[in-house]
Structure formats: structure tokens, C-alpha cells
Amino acid sequence: MAENMTIATMAQPSESPSKSGEEAPASTNPAATSAPPRPPRVPYHQIYKLPAPIRTFPLPTFYPSNPLSLFHLAVAWLRQVLLPPPAEPSVIHEGIWDPDTRSVHVKDPKSIRALWEQGFYGKGSLSRSEPNWFKRELSRRGLDGTTVSEERTASRREERRQVKWERAKAELEAIEKQKHEEAKLNSETVNAAIPEPPAAEIEPEPEVLLSSLPDHVLSATSTIPLSRAAPTNEFVPKTVAHGHVEPKPPVGPLELLALPNSYALVRGEELALSQPEPAPTEENVRKELKAPVGPIELLALPNSLVDLVALSVVSVLSEDAGVDEDESSTEDQLEASALTNDEPETSATEANDSTSSSSPPHTDGLPDSQPTQENVPATPERRKSVRFSSTVESTTFQHTDAASEVKNNNGSSDVEVFSSFVSAVEKPVILNVEPTVISQELVDKEHFQLAPEEAFFLTFGLGALRVVDPVTEAPISNEQLLIKLRANSYFPPRSVDNLSPEDPFLVQYAVYHHFRSLGWVPRHGIKFGVDWIIYQRGPVFDHSEFGIMVVPSFSDPRWSEFEHEESKKTWSWLMGVNRVLSHVLKSLVLVYVDVPPPPVFDEEMKKGGIAAALKKFTIREVMVRRFSVNRNR
């Protein structure tokens, strides 16, 4: 395969040897000595020591200056010849082809960990990359004391967000303080520029003798200024003959910023000042709400819909209660006035058993000839007949009942009824059934997904994976799997007769196989708007440094005889992708894939199979850097 590499691989940083011989100083803190020691953590370079799901047995290094190294080399070679290790790959994992998701699913936990730890293949169906949903659920339920990478990432992001918020707050406070100091300095400068009147021009006020004033003036006067008040340092604007403030040209920054932006704003202010301001009402106050942007406002929000409904109902009930209290106070006053004018009652029984035929009482100061309302008592409550039942039953509050009454039949308020209703909704309904033991066993519901390129590389390139049919459970050969993956790279899937060398799967797999062969770890880069992102060692050790965009190229002149789809990329697309990658500290690499024409590809497939056909794809990399005047001089 003809390849032109323009990307210089970065040298891996040499790991400094650990100073195991040096002992740590003894801790004098008693809390540190009493805390239980943590279990030793396995280093990452031991967990992910295999770059591929196969094992290699290299021979020891031979040093010509050391004769013993030759003996070591001979012993290792004889051991591998006489007692050869098992053929690699010794473990073949099994995956199931899923046509719905167009991926290969792996469900064996051992195979999942092996494929992830030995090359970073695939991703968890319920996770971002590493399949740790089960550990995350254990940590969330408190069944395991360990933490997962997602929780640590979330905590770091929260710390960064809090630091940014504190920094912005400090900057805003500094700006406000600077504005206040500038305004104070500006006012002092203006006041100092105003000349004070000379002392000779100030006419002294005549002295007033209190003894010379009449008595009625002394009694009406509380205090009399005996001297002229000292001039204040506050700014006093000059006035002209008409009594208006003398306008000054806006020369300072504060005056320029205070000017209106257009005549419409000036006209609007004049209209607003001319119209009387309406009195604030409760509805207007309620409408003046601000968006909760601070941490205190966010914490003040209700936690659930039940709390929100409770707050609204309580506010409505409080308003109704206030209105009813006013009405009840008026009724109490009327009842008190009626009781003072009525005759004294003999007993409560006579008052309750009185009928409508009794004569109404006469009010004082009104003649008998004045028409009065008959059969209407002074207080409606005195006309009611109260009877108690021998059986007392609790009142049932239905969900559809309106919460407009302040008092219920049992004497409880609507607020108490609604609070009991909310507590009943939040509490689980306890039925009269036998208690059953709920199993606390957590089932792992996550499976492992392999992309088509990853699955075919493990199957064809390494031979460490066997893909089976989901219906017949029969193994799928490499040729059949290639045809299936090529057909499903289109939507909807194409038939076998309509396939060509420019299939998206062939182009993408050529790039994936190319970078895997060079030792990189390519993974899908849809998150960053690119086709692939490549890691030097893996996502556990470092961040990806490059983003890959695959561009098919039809440079062979024989492509003019066949229909093919040219890539339609614009400069705006290129600048947009480059800007996105620059924000995440990645470099854009355009990978041009020279696709062979159909006759050449079909001929190589018949002669040498898949390997011979893939050799006809040529890879060319072009690094794209954003031009900067300061950096590219």
C-alpha cells in the first residue's frame, strides 16, 4: 500500500523511575494514622499493557559487548522452538451482528473488558466510552465505595464552573468599585471648579433679639437661625434667570454614556414622565419576575411539581382567607350590634328552636310605621338549626373537589387538607398484602458495541473476533461480512449488484486500518464534527491530538467512465471544522483516499482477496493549520 505520511509521531514521554528505596517521612497527624489504609491501586500501564488482543513473545536483546546476552538469546530461542506457545490469538471473542444499529454487539463480560483494555475497541451502550454503567449504578446506590470516571469528570467540571463564577463575580465587583471611585472623583472635580462667593460680598444678617419679639411670635417659633449656614461641598448647579438648570456639554465618559441612543428613547421618556404612574398592584408585582441565574435563586426553585402546586394553592387559599376574614369581621360587627338591640335570650335551646313566625325586634330610634324586612334575622347564623348525629364519619377529600372553601365540615382548613393530600400523594400506598422481599441484586443491562470498522479489523486484521448471525447463530465469513458491511453503509441498504469501490465503508475502513497499523488508536469523532480522532496511546492516558476528515479522491483517469459522487466541500466548511477543533486543542488532518476504479478493484478481489483489494487504496495526509499573524511570521 503506497502511503505518504506527513504527520510526525510524537515521542512518548519517558516515565521517571519510582523512588521505591526512599522512605516517606512519618506522619505526625493522628487522624492520618487512625484512618484505614486504602487498597493499592493497579497502575494504568499494567492494566492496558497489551495494545492489541493478542500476545507477542519477543526475543531478548543481544548486546555484542556482553557475551552473556548471547546465551540468554539462545535459551529463549530454543524454548520457543522446542515448546512453542499457543497460536495467537489464543482467545477468540464472539459478537452478534445487529442490523438495526448497524454494529456488532458483545455481551460476554470477559470479552468486553478484554476488548476495551487491549486496544480500546468499542464503547458501552449506556456509557460514553468505557463500559462502566454497572459500576456507576453501584456507586449511585451506595453499594460500592469506589468512584467512576464520569463522576470525577462531573466534579472537575463543577469545580471549574464555580471557579469561573467566582472570578467573574470578583471582576464585576472590581469594575463597580472603579466606577464608583471615578464618579466620586468626577464630582469632587466639578465641585472644586465652582468658585465660592467672596466673604466681602456676604452681607451679615442683623441680630435678632428675642426679647423684642411679641409673645405670640415666640410661642409659634421653635428655632431661629442666628448665623448663616456654612457652604456645603456638594455640587450645586448654576441657575439662569428663567430658573432652569444650565445645560453643560457632555465631555466626560460618564456624560457620554448617559446620553440616549436615539430620539425615540427621548420621546419615550417624555411620554413616560407626562403620564401618571399607575399604583402598584399585586398582579403587577407578580408579573415582575426575573430569571433564576444565581445559585441562591436556583436553590429557591421548587423541587417537584407537587411543591409548585402546593405553593400556588396556598397562595390562593391565603387570598380567600383574607377576603373571608374581612367579611366575617363585618358580620361579627352586625351581629354584635343586633345582639345589643335584641332582648336577652332565655336559653340556647329557645334561640335555636325559634321559628320564622316570631316578631322581629325593633331597633331603637325607629318608629313602628317604618317598613322593615320580615322573616330576615339580624344574623343568618342565629337562624340555623344544629343537629348532631350519633355516628361520626370522617370527611373524604376528592382530587376533583375545588379548594375554595376555607372551612370544611370537620372544622379543618383547606391548607391542612391540601397538606395532608400532598403527603398522601408522596407516601406510597400501603396495601393489606403480605410483605415480599425485594431483591437488591443489580443486573448489568449494558452491552458492548463495536463499530463496523472496528469489528472488521478484529475479524479480518487480527482474527480475534467471530461475528455470528443473529437468527441462525452461524459464524459469518470475512467475505460475507465485508459485503454486509458495505451494503449497510448506505441508507437504505443497497443490494450486492449496486456496490462499488467508493462505498463509505471501504473508504473509512482503509483509513482506520492505516492508522491502526501505525500504532494510533482511532475512534469515531462525531462529537467534534470529524470522522475520526486518533490517540497516541488511548483515551485513558491522554487526549486526542488530531481530528481526521476523510476525503475520497478519484484521481485515476479511468473514473471518468464510471459514475461516482464527488466530494462537495466548501471553504466555509473547512474553516468551521478547523475552528471547532482549535477550540478543543486539536489539529485538523485531511486524509485523501485515492479510490481505485471498479475494474481494478474487482480484479484484485478475484486474484488476492480482500487484502489485495485494500492495497489499491492510497492514503495521503495533509495537515491544516490555522494562520495566525503572531505565530506564522
Curated annotation (Swiss-Prot):
Gene3D superfamilies assigned to the protein according to its UniProt record, in alphabetical order: 3.40.1350.10
Region (Disordered): 1-42, 320-410
Active-site residue list: 535, 543, 586
Biased composition (Polar residues): 1-19, 387-410
Chemical reaction(s) catalysed: pretRNA = a 3'-half-tRNA molecule with a 5'-OH end + a 5'-half-tRNA molecule with a 2',3'-cyclic phosphate end + an intron with a 2',3'-cyclic phosphate and a 5'-hydroxyl terminus
Biased segments, Low complexity type: 24-35, 346-364
UniProt keyword Lyase present: yes
Gene Ontology molecular function: lyase activity; nucleic acid binding; tRNA-intron endonuclease activity
GO cellular component terms, A-Z: cytoplasm; tRNA-intron endonuclease complex
Alphabetical UniProt keywords: Lyase, tRNA processing
Presence of keyword Lyase: yes
InterPro entries: tRNA_endonuc-like_dom_sf (IPR011856), tRNA_intron_Endo_cat-like_sf (IPR036167), tRNA_intron_Endonuc_cat-like (IPR006677), tRNA_splic (IPR006676)
EC number, UniProt record: 4.6.1.16
Record family assignment: Belongs to the tRNA-intron endonuclease family.
Quaternary structure and partners: tRNA splicing endonuclease is a heterotetramer composed of tsp-2/sen2, tsp-1/sen15, tsp-4/sen34 and tsp-5/sen54. Interacts directly with tsp-5/sen54.
Protein name: Probable tRNA-splicing endonuclease subunit tsp-2
